[in-house]
């Protein structure tokens, strides 16, 4: 299962590749489970939108768009994001945004055109390097320049949602998430205080509590406890 370090690796990889790219169209192979948005919302807020940033909070990725919407992605147990290049093509996308229809062509992307490599991250299996889409592909996003982003998920626990950017922080699980272990402002003292609030619980479940520390799962909880020479069933 991708945990915080793996999801951060995906964020960094996509942050180098996606900003500036314009969405031309999508193909959803597992609707509505993996991508529950209504087609009208996808057409209005995703088609023709330009990627502005790729962010992460805990194990959740956010691809921000210039429509003030974001693609929010949770890889869960077996999720992957795979970016592939292909021959460039021209596409025209009309949307009924409040600012009016716009035509998106290859020239719309020309100011950020560059030669780059493919990227893949998430759960390790053959879909990271194989032909796509395959049987695990849930969502395919085509960009105006011909590149594509595939959301693969073998077990179908992961999801992708299109949400207003300013509403993402209000999602229930986002409001409960604790401090980021990679944030330089996160102090060991604060972490210890949060752990101590779980009095009489075993220390490993306390590590796995996302309200205590963000993004830690079984792998890194085990590694941290091994490094500290603490048994997972030690009481807080």
Predicted regions and their residues:
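Basic, nucleic-acid-binding surfaces and adjacent catalytic neighborhoods in DNA/RNA-processing proteins
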Residues: 22-45, 55, 192-236
């Amino acid at each position: 299962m991708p945990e915080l370090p793996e999801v951060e690796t995906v964020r960094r990889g996509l942050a180098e590749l996606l900003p500036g790219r314009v969405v031309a169209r999508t193909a959803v192979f597992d609707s509505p489970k993996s991508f529950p948005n209504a087609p009208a919302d996808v057409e209005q807020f995703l088609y023709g939108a330009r990627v502005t940033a790729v962010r992460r909070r805990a194990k959740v990725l956010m691809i921000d768009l210039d429509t003030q919407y974001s693609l929010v992605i949770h890889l869960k147990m077996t999720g992957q994001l795979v970016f592939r290049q292909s021959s460039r093509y021209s596409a025209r996308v009309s949307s009924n945004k409040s600012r009016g229809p716009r035509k998106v062509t290859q020239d719309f992307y020309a100011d950020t055109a560059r030669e780059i490599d493919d990227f893949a991250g998430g759960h390790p299996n053959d879909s990271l390097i194989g032909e796509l889409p395959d049987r695990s592909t849930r969502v395919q996003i085509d960009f105006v320049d011909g590149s594509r982003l595939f959301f693969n998920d073998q077990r179908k626990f992961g999801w992708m949602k299109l949400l207003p950017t300013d509403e993402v922080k209000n999602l229930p699980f986002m409001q409960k998430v604790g401090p980021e272990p990679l944030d330089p402002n996160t102090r060991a003292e604060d972490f210890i205080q949060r752990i101590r609030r779980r009095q009489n619980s075993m220390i490993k479940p306390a590590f796995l509590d996302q309200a205590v520390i963000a993004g830690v799962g079984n792998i890194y909880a085990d590694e941290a406890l091994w490094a500290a020479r603490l048994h997972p069933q030690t009481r807080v």
